[in-house]
Amino acid sequence: RSEKYVANDDLIVHGGDVSIFSKKIHPINRLIKTAKLNPNASIILLCKKVKDTSRYGVPKISLISKELFEVDEVVEKPSKPKSSYAIMPIYFFKPEIFSYLNKIKRGKNNELQLTDAIQKTIEYGNKVLAIPMKSYDVDLDVGTPESYKHALDASYKWIH
């Protein structure tokens, strides 16, 4: 539904189940800067190194630098992850993401999965990059009741 409002503009998508705070440069600003420096990238992902990848989309990456990865493949909640990075729910997309969303089948709960559209973008030969979260970035997950309570407690500490 949002395609008609985006038209030919690039866009940032931020999932509603995680808030990210930063003591320095916010990841959204880093995504935008990375997009300006890499205008041929169709998608730029934000990734975080995690111990348990079972709740995340996971990228298979090639290191360009310690600040930038090329994404070779993405899989949602893989049984055998190809990296220890999780895709965080803040994305930079060129508007062609909509054509790839239109090429994929609906998944669980009849929803289109961004991970599937990102993989389709890669399969069609488009460049997908990722930047890592920094040590000064904090993500607060509100996807489960336990993580929601933790996020409330942590955000209260953050502002006081």
What are the functions of these language-model segments?
Residues R1-V58, L63, N102-I104:
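Conserved beta-loop-beta/alpha segment of the NTase-like Rossmann-fold superfamily
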Residues I12, I32-K36, S65-V142, E146-H160:
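Catalytic-core segments of class I nucleotidyltransferases/pyrophosphorylases
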